[in-house]
Amino acid sequence: MKYIGAHVSAAGGLANAPARAAEIGATAFALFTKNQRQWRAAPLTPQVIDDFKIACEKYHFSAAQILPHDSYLINLGHPVSEALEKSRDAFLDEMQRCEQLGLTLLNFHPGSHLMQIAQEDCLARIAESINIALAQTEGVTAVIENTAGQGSNLGFEFEQLAAIIDGVEDKSRVGVCIDTCHAFAAGYDLRTPEACEKTFAGFGKIVGFQYLRGMHLNDAKSAFGSRVDRHHSLGEGNIGHDAFRWIMQDGRFDGIPLILETINPDIWAEEIAWLKAQQIAEAVA
């Protein structure tokens, strides 16, 4: 079964996120559990936690259907020790918030070397950062998102994701989220079913589908291999509809949150309905 949704706003309270997801016909959603552009946030109160859990139950969202995203400020591979510690503390707080909310996944961008340390050293720092957070939490999986490779961001090659996973001690609590726009911008072709087969065969060989814990379904304004991260609405960008139809009709993408971060929230309901229809087309066939 496919869990399909979007990254919805939690404005006005975390309990509003499941309601907003239900409004657009979603069977999955992503959210920020705090302001993503601030380092610090007030601790979650028992009332906030209870309200969120009640809302998730009301709208029939289990933890497997929810993919929280951490703060954009965090860099788990930061080359400067003081800044690295600040990021590690913030990441641990994000993991603990998920733990408190009964959530089992935390999606994050791996990190950037800022042209100050070697790629290998940065990847090792990211893995160490994950180990530190996992050792102090229970039940939450660290879900590494592939990047477009903009600037000095790492995680744009499957080999880099595999290297991070290799350095994580508890393999049962690490996974990946593949963003289609990021993959395309990083040079992984998705424009035809044949291209999708080839790209994900490579993913299966290098990373492994056992680590796939979520996806971001985004078309790309950016050009193939441009290393530029610019999302677009499904079918409106340089990837096209075929990739998303192919994903909907492949069982390897069942049972994980498939999240839209496309640029027009006004048509998320339509995009979700379209994705669901592709799944039905498979069943009919």
UniProtKB/Swiss-Prot annotation:
Its cofactor is Zn(2+). It catalyses: Endonucleolytic cleavage to 5'-phosphooligonucleotide end-products. Keywords: DNA damage, DNA repair, Endonuclease, Hydrolase, Metal-binding, Nuclease, Zinc. PROSITE patterns: AP_NUCLEASE_F2_1, AP_NUCLEASE_F2_2, AP_NUCLEASE_F2_3, AP_NUCLEASE_F2_4. GO terms for molecular function: deoxyribonuclease IV (phage-T4-induced) activity; DNA binding; DNA-(apurinic or apyrimidinic site) endonuclease activity; phosphoric diester hydrolase activity; zinc ion binding. Zn(2+) 3 binds at H182, D229, H231. SUPFAM superfamilies: Xylose isomerase-like (SSF51658). It comes from the Bacteria. Zn(2+) 1 binds at H69, H109, E145. Zn(2+) 2 binds at E145, D179, H216, E261. It holds the Pfam family AP_endonuc_2. Binds 3 Zn(2+) ions. Its EC number is 3.1.21.2. GO terms for biological process: base-excision repair. Endonuclease IV plays a role in DNA repair. It cleaves phosphodiester bonds at apurinic or apyrimidinic (AP) sites, generating a 3'-hydroxyl group and a 5'-terminal sugar phosphate. Belongs to the AP endonuclease 2 family. This is Probable endonuclease 4. It comes from Salmonella agona (strain SL483).
